[in-house]
Amino acid sequence: DDAKFYYGADGKRVNYIGWQLIDGIYYYKEGNQFIRNQSKKIKGDWYLFDLQGKMVTGFSTPEITSEYDDNYYYYGNDGRRQFYTGWQLINGKWYYFDESSRAAKGWKTINGVKYYFETITKATDEYNNEYFVGNSDHFMYTGYGIIDGEFYYFDANGACQGIDTSYTG
């Protein structure tokens, strides 16, 4: 049987149904088992539970569940799936979501502007060049760009080639 049970500090099995807060982590119990390795609609909202049954927050990734479909979806701090579209500022970083609420990844052209997205880590290419998407203007630098008062040089693909101390603008 694939059942997983939890026991309280008193050594007794937890038998409650519904949301469970165990050691600061939320789980959801249905029948005699905790929901694991799947998304679940609960009272009108979608939640994702990992292989151990922990409620997921942040971006879904392949390591979280075997239900993963090679797309990134975002779950808020309360665990509810967010059905974002367009540009979203999350924890100080910009992300772009398509009409199906999937976070953009790889190269995308949006409103005629080319961007490179890596949803979980910084944007890089296969050569580990770094890319920069401006926090307010949503653009990809090519040529010289100023970031935090420093002059950087970006190649035609937007790959950062480093700080240029000789450039005066």
Language model segments and positions:
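Extracellular adhesion/carbohydrate-binding repeat motifs centered on closely spaced tryptophans
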Residues: 1-169
